[in-house]
Amino acid sequence: GARPARPAMNPADDSAAAPADPALEISLPTSLELCQLGLATMVDIRQAFEIELKGAIPDTVHIPLFEVKQLLGHPLTEDEQDILDAGRPTPVDVQGFFTTINRLHHVHDQIVLIVCNSGRRSLYAAQLLRDMGYPKALSVAGGFQAWKKLQAAAPAPAQP
């Protein structure tokens, strides 16, 4: 038999039961499409050393999340502190962070796509931005890992 249509997600309904707001997350292929259309900008929130070690995603703005969390006065978990301590501190100031996000979100009316290594930290960051008044913040599901898989599956044209 035909499956009943799923009710439309109500973005205002944030029941505490759901671990992550589904409307907070976006798939990588959709993210890349939005970027190509000029509707969105990807913000890589990994620490600088992670990007050096694992590689960067082209055309992303880099804002390390943990520095931002600290700047905003949010406590870091032990793991986060370890990661923060593992790399050289990235010079980030709150003003610069907000200037960047404001420019993307308000001036250019961009969807802010947050990417981390696996898609966990970016969910937190997207929620943080939403709470701070940036409704178009989304977390890229799967993060950098998903991007690498996608690259492996579809060989990119050779870079000059």
Which residues does each predicted region cover?
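Rhodanese-like catalytic fold shared by cysteine-dependent sulfurtransferases
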Residues: R3-T41, A48-L113, S118-P160
